[in-house]
C-alpha cells in the first residue's frame, strides 16, 4: 500500500530491504517465548527452542515468517518441535499460554501490555537466528509526508521502543 501510494506509512515486520521504501524507524523485533507466570522457565533470563520442546507448544502456521524462522533454526539443530496447537491468531495462543496449556511465541509489541500487567511472561529465545527480524515504520522513498502524518510517525517513534 505504501509503494502504490494508497497509504502514507506502513508498519511491518521486515527481514530485508524493499525497493522504493524508506525506513523512518527501525527496531529489532526478535521472536520471544511466551510462558505463563509461575512456569518453571519463567524466571530464566532466556530460553532455547530445545527447552521449549519439552512442553506443549502453540505455534504459528508454517507459511508465517515467525514459523519459518523457527523451522530454519530447528533444522540447523536437528530439532523437531511438535505443536499441540497451530494458530495465527494472537489472542488464541495468548489464551492457551495464560490458561496453562503450554508455551508459545510472539513479538514483544504484540504482548507488551500483558507482560506489563503480569498476565504473561515473555523471554528472549537465545538460539542464533531468532532475532533476525525488525519492526519498521516505512514511507515511500522521495515522498514528503503531510504534517499530520509526520506527527504520527514521530509519535510511533516515541511509543514503539520496547524492552528488546
Indicate residue ranges for each PLM-predicted region.
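Residues embedded in well-ordered beta-strands
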Residues: 32-34, 40, 56, 103, ...
Amino acid at each position: 500500500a505504501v509503494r502504490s501510494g494508497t497509504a502514507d506509512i506502513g508498519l511491518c515486520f521486515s527481514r530485508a530491504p524493499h525497493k522504493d521504501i524508506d525506513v523512518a524507524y527501525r527496531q529489532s523485533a526478535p521472536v520471544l517465548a511466551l510462558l505463563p507466570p509461575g512456569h518453571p522457565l519463567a524466571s530464566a533470563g532466556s530460553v532455547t527452542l530445545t527447552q521449549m520442546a519439552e512442553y506443549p507448544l502453540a505455534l504459528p502456521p508454517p507459511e508465517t515468517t515467525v514459523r519459518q524462522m523457527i523451522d530454519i533454526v530447528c533444522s540447523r539443530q536437528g530439532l523437531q518441535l511438535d505443536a499441540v496447537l497451530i494458530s495465527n491468531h494472537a489472542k488464541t495462543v495468548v489464551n492457551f499460554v495464560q490458561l496453562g496449556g503450554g508455551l508459545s511465541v510472539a513479538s514483544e509489541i504484540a504482548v507488551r501490555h500483558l507482560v506489563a500487567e503480569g498476565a504473561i511472561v515473555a523471554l528472549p529465545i537465545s538460539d542464533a537466528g531468532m532475532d533476525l527480524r525488525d519492526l519498521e515504520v516505512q514511507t515511500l522513498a522521495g515522498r514528503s509526508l503531510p504534517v499530520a502524518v509526520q506527527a504520527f510517525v514521530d509519535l510511533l517513534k516515541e511509543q514503539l521502543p520496547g524492552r528488546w
